[in-house]
Amino acid sequence: MANKLEITLKRSVIGRPEDQRVTVRTLGLKKTNQTVVHEDNAAIRGMINKVSHLVSVKEQ
């Protein structure tokens, strides 16, 4: 696994269930097309899997 993950919010959270909104917010994403970098670990991977239809992930 890569050391870092570059996560970009590709779709809006408008109209999404509250748990998905909270997950996106917890990842540090507020606006569409915003990108954040996180360490690659099981917790982050789990959050990405939960909102995989809203984000894109690039390994660094």
From Swiss-Prot:
Cited PROSITE patterns: RIBOSOMAL_L30
Keywords: Ribonucleoprotein, Ribosomal protein
One Pfam short name: Ribosomal_L30
A cellular component annotation (GO) from this entry: cytosolic large ribosomal subunit
Example GO molecular function: structural constituent of ribosome
CDD domains (UniProt xref): Ribosomal_L30
One example of a Gene Ontology biological process annotation: translation
UniProt keyword Metal-binding present: no
Family of this protein: Belongs to the universal ribosomal protein uL30 family.
HAMAP family reported in the protein's UniProt record: Ribosomal_uL30_B (MF_01371_B)
PANTHER family per the UniProt record, alphabetical: LARGE RIBOSOMAL SUBUNIT PROTEIN UL30M, MITOCHONDRIAL RIBOSOMAL PROTEIN L30
Subunit description: Part of the 50S ribosomal subunit.
Descriptive protein name: Large ribosomal subunit protein uL30
Organism: Bacillus pumilus (strain SAFR-032)
Gene: rpmD
